[in-house]
Amino acid sequence: EIQFIMDGKKYVARNLWMYPLGTIGRDMMYQLFSSFMWTFILLTKGLTAGQIAAVTGIMIGARIFDAFNDPIMGVIIEKTKTRWGKFKPWLAIGMILTVGVIITTFAVDVTGWAFVGLFGAMYFAYSITYTMHDISYWGMIPALSSNPGTRDKYSSRAVLFAGIGSTLAGMLIPMLTVGDGAIGGSTNSGYAWVAVGISVLSLIFICFTIFGVKEVQEDEVKDSSTLVTNKKEAQPVKKDNNGIKKMIKVIAKNKPLLWIIVAFLLQQIGNGLITSGIGSTYIYFQYGFNGGNYSLFSTIGVAATAVLMVLYPTISRNVPRKKLMTILLIVGLIGYAIMGLCTVHFLPLNIEFWVLTAGFTLSNFGQYGIYLVMMISILNTV
């Protein structure tokens, strides 16, 4: 037992690298499918107004579907029992299936209503497959440690590495798909090859988590080792039979979690509008179809958040969470105000671009800081 506890401490140091490395590729996939989907469609498919409306309806329908899909998948994962645990099998299955969905979406060359049909099938499939590995990935944190401080370390480092993946994708995808740097000489071939490349990288990175992470709850091991000295005296612990109804009741009674869910929803809507919709489209149409412009815009904006992710463990020990949320909210609002002023076009175009980028940097700093605080808060309220 003593050796096992010592190994548990060793696993924490290893897990702090193996766990976050796994999400670099996941977030590159997420960026490609979420932030660049509309850009891909607008630049390569030549859809009619009716077809674009159909695509929009599919996206909205998939988001509504997620509201039911996510909790159901959470229960399925929770009930999973295998020799590899309940998280890693779904990590592997979800990643492999998501890779297939992404390559099919970006590499199959169809247009018109044929594309709309393919897109509908792939978009809903993506909602299912990405949820498989996303819930299992973030759900693994409580299984790594029951100590809130240790969980904070896992969460902040995972978000940092997720930011690295997002930054790499945001920097490379525009450069490799639009303009002179497009792989294969066209935007169509550029997106196809980028989808393949990111898919391969995502499978490589997730292997660090699947094969390198050891699920050890140090504190529970210590408690059990001190309280139970005779194995014959140990009694089996009856596990709760969690289901959808019980989960809904638990969430409904957990007021802190309910408020966090509402805040999370609003934060994600705002973030999605700026980075996944308006942001990339506005940059392309206002400043030209040069992939380098959007690469600069997204890279500088996202890179600023890396500072927060690195310093978060220190900040969280010295700044109360409520005060930190207030500061981050103010910073984000200032950034959005600057971006809004840029749409008035009172500056020369080249200067306006850099002012817009500065605004995005501030807004992104606030957005991702709030995301990190809420992510940790959810883990601590469950």
State the predicted function of each range.
Residues 1-382:
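Membrane-embedded alpha-helical bundles of multi-pass transporters/translocases
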